[in-house]
């Protein structure tokens, strides 16, 4: 059995790590490189960095901090933010990232997924999906430009359909960002994860809702996700990654030590 991954998520805005609640009201957490270093030392399996306003600002993620992160950590990391071309992706990978993740640019140009997968290999192409449960319709809808509160909008895609579409186009991994749960620390949306898992045949990473160690165990044991991504519980030192791995091992979850 493959070990389950613990993945701290660092949202980057104006050169600093920030965290919001349900993708709004972001507060500054701290500097990028020291936080990355801390998580690597605590035992994180990999890191994910989202430049949350790059797409809505029409720019590519700032590559200077990508190089600095690569110098100080020895675990894989993934970078997202305004990657619209193969050239954009190549530069980020050259600066030291192991994977690139695309979200809003993939919605704007789905062919980009195939282009990147063909050029760099599916193993380093991640598609992030921001999924919102609309209580009025009872459906999970994909949203775009979620890093900018004023530009956030629903797309034509229902989550399950988009998950299937991105796989056809070459996504090597999917990060499911569950917007309703983001930052509220009440647990992952297990129902949604199981729905997506049914049609997802590449590694699936749960994102949004972790507040206690049991939430990670539930995600792994009840939905069979490959990794769990979290931010505020790590940023605010509510959960220590080493202690989390000890706990998960006791819950019969295979983790890297």
Swiss-Prot record:
Q: What class of enzyme is it?
A: lyase
Record protein name field: Imidazole glycerol phosphate synthase subunit HisF
Chief location category? cytoplasm
Keyword field? Amino-acid biosynthesis, Cytoplasm, Histidine biosynthesis, Lyase
Q: Which GO MF term does the entry hold, naming one? A: lyase activity
- Family annotation (SUPFAM superfamilies): Ribulose-phoshate binding barrel
What is the similarity comment for this entry? Belongs to the HisA/HisF family.
Q: What role does this protein play?
A: IGPS catalyzes the conversion of PRFAR and glutamine to IGP, AICAR and glutamate. The HisF subunit catalyzes the cyclization activity that produces IGP and AICAR from PRFAR using the ammonia provided by the HisH subunit.
Q: What is its EC number?
A: 4.3.2.10
Q: Does the keyword Amino-acid biosynthesis apply?
A: yes
Which Gene Ontology cellular component terms are annotated? cytoplasm
Q: Which pathway does it take part in?
A: Amino-acid biosynthesis; L-histidine biosynthesis; L-histidine from 5-phospho-alpha-D-ribose 1-diphosphate: step 5/9
Catalytic activity, reaction form: 5-[(5-phospho-1-deoxy-D-ribulos-1-ylimino)methylamino]-1-(5-phospho-beta-D-ribosyl)imidazole-4-carboxamide + L-glutamine = D-erythro-1-(imidazol-4-yl)glycerol 3-phosphate + 5-amino-1-(5-phospho-beta-D-ribosyl)imidazole-4-carboxamide + L-glutamate + H(+)
GO biological process terms held by the UniProt record:
L-histidine biosynthetic process
How it assembles, according to the record, is: Heterodimer of HisH and HisF.
Protein localization:
Cytoplasm
The record's listing under Pfam families reads: His_biosynth
Q: Which residues form the active site?
A: 11, 130
């Amino acid at each position: 059995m493959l070990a389950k991954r613990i993945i701290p998520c660092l949202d980057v805005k104006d050169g600093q790590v920030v965290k919001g609640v349900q993708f709004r009201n972001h507060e500054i957490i701290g500097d990028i490189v020291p936080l990355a270093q801390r998580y690597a030392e605590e035992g994180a399996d990999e890191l994910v960095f989202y430049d949350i306003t790059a797409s809505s600002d029409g720019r590519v993620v700032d590559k200077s901090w990508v190089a600095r992160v690569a110098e100080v950590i020895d675990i894989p990391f993934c970078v997202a933010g305004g990657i619209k071309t193969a050239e954009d992706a190549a530069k980020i990978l050259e600066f030291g990232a192991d994977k690139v993740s695309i979200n809003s640019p993939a919605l704007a140009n789905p062919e980009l997924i195939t282009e990147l997968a063909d050029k760099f290999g599916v193993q380093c192409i991640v598609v992030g999906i921001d999924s919102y449960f609309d209580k009025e319709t009872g459906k999970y809808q994909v949203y775009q430009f979620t890093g900018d509160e004023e530009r956030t909008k629903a797309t034509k895609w229902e989550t399950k359909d988009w998950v299937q579409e991105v796989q056809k186009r070459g996504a090597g991994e999917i990060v499911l960002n569950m917007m309703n749960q983001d930052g509220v620390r009440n647990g992952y949306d297990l129902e949604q994860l199981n729905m997506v898992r049914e049609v997802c045949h590449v590694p699936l990473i749960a994102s949004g809702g972790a507040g206690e160690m049991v939430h990670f165990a539930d995600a792994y044991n009840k939905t069979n996700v490959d990794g769990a991504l979290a931010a505020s519980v790590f940023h605010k030192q509510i959960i220590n990654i080493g202690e989390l791995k000890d706990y998960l091992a006791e819950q019969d979850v295979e983790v890297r030590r």
